[in-house]
Amino acid sequence: MEKYRAYETLKKLAFERVSGTDKELEAAHLLVKECQAMGVEAHIESFEIPAPEITKVSLTLTSPVEKSFYCTGQGRSGQTPEEGIEAPFQYIYNGEDEYIGNVQGKIVMTTGSMTQDLRKKLIDRGALGYIVTWGGYYDDEIMQTQVPHRFTRPAKDDNSNFPGVMMNLNTAKKLLQEKPENVKMVLRQNNDTKGESRNVVAEIKGYEKPEEVVVFSAHYDSVEFSQGAWDNGSGSVTIMEICHYFAENPPKRTVRFVWCGSEEIGLMGSWAYCKQHTEELKNIILNINFDMTGVLMAKNMVFGSCDKGIIDYAAFKGKLHGIHFDSKMGYMPSDCTSFALNDVPAMSFGTDSPRGGAEIHSRRDTMDVMDKDELETIVNFCCAFASDVVNAVINPIPSEIPEDITKTKEDTKKKFGLY
């Protein structure tokens, strides 16, 4: 294995790669080129994504003073009349029941998530619109205007009109400090526009058990305003190095590599892959996902939607390599969950930074937070772990996902809007 190759590849990939954009396509072609350079064929698989077009958005405090606050529109949430809606304002904290009993005819703000359940409760109680937040309390003026354009994932049967906007948490703080009485929201959009995103897929056939497949996945898209070096250029180059490893050391089992597009808008690339390859899923013995590796000053994590013995083994092998892993069982918000929801045992490696450490989903996610030695260490470990699974004498992976995980399957689908 070529030392620091992963870090050098990451430098080439560290640019904004938003779902459905030309830059995401540029990154996809870069990944294909990297595979082909090592003699592994790769191809792009396209899929459709929602791409709601926001044509007008604003949020204005009208009483007790008049002041505008920067925001972006929530795609697919709904829309106001052309002239907007003016209504009393209410802050509902994280949307707990204690705070939403008297929201009729109001525009509400939550610093929690606008879940499908909360959306329904607010609509049923007569709320007219909502504000959600993004970013941090201490973000500077630049960050306060770098609010991404996100869209909601309403429930499958939800055709309601409930317009929403998003603002930076610091901006929201300033709004609350004005003791708002009434606000005016304007949101106009076209909900029906579609876009195109892509997965990149490569494969090396196994020489002994080609019918048994291990899939390595990582999303390669980023959010707006971010180079996405940590999230998730790092995971993308990790599986590229695993691909290098098996190109140089032919595997007993087939290894497949899926660089997923559009993870940042709801696991859409991995979900599309599973739906486009339904018949092939039965041959996948394990999905190993990588989301955020090799950052400076962070703890290593391993997550499992699979038999706990696999996760315990990963943690044990980490000890042999002098690496500690915190572990957790269940569905996690990354592409491994798409596989697990389609009954493929799945796991994911990642890192978590301390409070005040490296950030994701902002302009601060750059190469400055990455460390070539940290990345090299985790890449070498992951290649060794991958080899253990791929080259095992017998398939070591139980095919059943434990019931204490699958009991939350439908709720997880609902959470991510995966149908």
Where are these predicted regions, by residue range?
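N-terminal capping segment at the start of a domain
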Residues: 1-23, 38, 45-47, 140-143, ...
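Catalytic-core environment of secreted peptidases
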Residues: 2-22, 32-42, 107-112, 129, ...
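Noncatalytic luminal/extracellular "stalk/propeptide" segments of secretory-pathway proteins
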Residues: 3, 8-107
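Second-shell loop/turn segments in exported
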Residues: 14-22, 32, 108-113, 160-162, ...
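Extracellular/luminal Protease-associated
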Residues: 69-156, 161, 325
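Soluble metallo-hydrolase cores and metallopeptidase-like ectodomains found primarily
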Residues: 71, 75-97, 148-229, 244, ...
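His/Asp/Glu-rich mid-to-C-terminal helical/loop segments that flank catalytic regions of hydrolases
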Residues: 244, 356-419
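Metal-dependent peptidase/peptidase-like ectodomains
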Residues: 260-359
